[in-house]
């Protein structure tokens, strides 16, 4: 059997979410998903009823649709996928002269 090397290892999502559930509740729900090793949620803007959040998820064989399902079931929506990584190892961004 061929080893799976195309699996998703990291997702960075820009998400608009309601104030309820809290990020503490949402991070726990996301962390319970199959293949998830860690989740970080940072709020970068708060409005009267919503929060803009950066959600970083790392693991092995992440299931994008299941992750989006958890976010949507809790009233959120994914605005964009800001980073995605796959393969046997995670490659960090390297600063170049253009940066």
Per-region residue spans from a language model:
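Long, contiguous binding/interaction regions
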Residues: 1-99
């Amino acid at each position: 059997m061929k080893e799976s090397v195309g699996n998703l290892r990291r997702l960075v999502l820009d998400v608009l979410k309601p104030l309820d559930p809290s990020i503490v509740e949402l991070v726990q729900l996301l962390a319970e998903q199959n293949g998830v090793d860690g989740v970080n949620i940072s709020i970068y803007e708060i409005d009267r009823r919503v929060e803009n959040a950066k959600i970083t998820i790392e693991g092995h064989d992440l299931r994008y649709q299941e992750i989006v399902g958890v976010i949507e079931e809790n009233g959120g929506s994914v605005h964009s996928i800001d980073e995605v990584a796959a393969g046997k190892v995670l490659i960090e961004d390297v600063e170049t002269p253009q940066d």
